[in-house]
C-alpha cells in the first residue's frame, strides 16, 4: 500500500520514489525535509539520516535495483541501482539485511551520477 512519494535530489539529478506504509517509511517522512552527504559502495548510494528503526519483518539483503532501503545498523538510506562489492549475481546485495521502504519511480541508474560527498536532499512530493 502506497504511503507517500518523496523526491531525492543531488547536484546532477533527481528521482521520485514511492514509499510503502511501513514503520520505517513513516519515520523517514516525519524527518523530512532533510539533507545528507552521499557515500557510494559499488552501484549503491547511501547516506546517514536522522531516523532510528528496528529491523522489520521482511527485511532483505538481496533486493531488485531501484529498491529504497533503510540500513538499520548504519541509520542510513540505501539506494542500490546495480551490483555492490558483495553481489553474487546481477542483483544488488546489501551489506546486511535492510528494511524495504519502497521503490524508485524512474531510472535508478541515474544514481550513477552521484559522487561521494554530494549533498542529497530529500523532500515530500
Residue ranges and their predicted role:
Residues 1:
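Extended, loop-rich substrate-binding clefts of extracytoplasmic carbohydrate-active enzymes
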Residues 4-5, 9:
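Helix-rich terminal scaffold detector
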Residues 14, 20-27, 31-125:
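Glycine-rich active-site loops that engage anionic ligands at enzyme catalytic sites
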Amino acid at each position: 500500500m502506497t504511503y507517500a512519494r518523496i523526491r531525492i535530489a543531488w547536484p546532477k539529478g533527481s528521482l521520485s520514489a514511492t514509499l510503502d506504509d511501513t514503520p520505517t517509511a513513516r519515520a523517514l517522512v516525519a524527518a523530512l525535509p532533510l539533507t545528507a552527504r552521499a557515500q557510494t559502495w559499488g552501484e549503491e548510494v547511501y547516506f546517514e539520516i536522522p531516523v532510528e528503526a528496528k529491523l522489520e519483518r521482511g527485511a532483505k539483503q538481496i533486493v531488485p535495483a531501484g529498491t529504497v532501503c533503510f540500513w538499520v545498523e548504519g541509520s542510513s538510506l540505501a539506494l542500490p541501482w546495480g551490483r555492490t562489492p558483495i553481489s553474487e549475481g546481477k542483483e544488488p546485495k546489501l551489506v546486511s539485511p535492510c528494511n524495504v521502504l519502497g521503490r524508485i519511480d524512474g531510472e535508478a541508474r541515474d544514481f550513477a551520477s552521484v559522487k561521494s560527498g554530494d549533498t542529497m536532499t530529500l523532500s515530500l512530493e
